[in-house]
């Protein structure tokens, strides 16, 4: 899935940006870009997460109302990003706002799961962990929690575990789609076999009737010939 790949790339860029690894090893000569890297990469994370959610959960078919909600969130988040980028780059620091789209993704995943879509269970776990990581990091940012190794890298841990469960979700979805395809193929094969059997049966019955009719005609012809001889 191309959207999942773009999402992973955005996550990697965001992780390198907040840790300073990107500035240290990749763009050390571009300090201006470093000021924007966190905000731009985080926007990429949220954007591709929202689009991936639409595709993975098939919200257009399974829940048109939730699909409209996701579209609205994409438009609003994109508008906020452009406003930050063009007018107030310092607003990129308010990363706590990402809790809103992540909460919406989590809620929609739960709703689709409860409707019986099995692959959504791993999806819900994945984004539930990511949402928890964002919340924990926000608590540290607002000094509600002290900085420890676990709290400082909580978001990194969440991203890693989230990707693991998203991989499970994708694998589960592929397996289910394959099973559906196999069942449909078996139904088609069975129907074709039934049609062939019916065709053979009709042909046999037709041949039998033609044979019977031929015997009758031959018998009548014989009778007629005998009658003429007399």
PLM feature spans:
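Amphipathic alpha-helical coiled-coil "transmission" helices that mediate dimerization
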Residues: 176-230
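Juxtamembrane interface at the cytosolic side of transmembrane helices
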Residues: 1-6
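Interfacial "cap-and-anchor" motif at the non-cytosolic start of specific transmembrane alpha-helices
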Residues: 10-190
């Amino acid at each position: 899935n191309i959207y999942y790949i773009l999402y992973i790339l955005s996550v990697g860029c965001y992780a390198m940006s907040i840790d300073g690894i990107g500035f240290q090893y990749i763009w050390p000569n571009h300090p201006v870009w470093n000021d924007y890297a966190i905000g731009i990469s985080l926007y990429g994370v949220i954007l591709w997460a929202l689009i991936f959610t639409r595709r993975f959960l098939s919200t257009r078919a399974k829940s048109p109302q939730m699909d409209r909600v996701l579209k609205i969130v994409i438009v609003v988040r994109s508008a906020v990003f452009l406003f930050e980028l063009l007018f107030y780059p310092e607003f990129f620091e308010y990363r706590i706002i990402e809790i809103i789209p992540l909460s919406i993704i989590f809620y929609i995943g739960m709703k689709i799961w409860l409707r019986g879509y099995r692959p959504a269970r791993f999806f819900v776990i994945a984004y539930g962990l990511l949402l928890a990581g964002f919340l924990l990091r926000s608590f540290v940012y607002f000094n509600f929690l002290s900085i420890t190794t676990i709290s400082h890298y909580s978001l990194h841990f969440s991203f890693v575990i989230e990707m693991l469960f998203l991989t499970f979700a994708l694998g589960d979805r592929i397996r289910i789609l394959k099973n559906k395809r196999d069942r449909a193929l078996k139904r088609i094969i069975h129907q074709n076999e039934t049609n062939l059997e019916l065709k053979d049966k009709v042909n046999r019955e037709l041949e039998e009737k033609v044979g019977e009719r031929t015997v009758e005609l031959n018998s009548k012809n014989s009778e007629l010939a005998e009658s003429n001889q007399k």
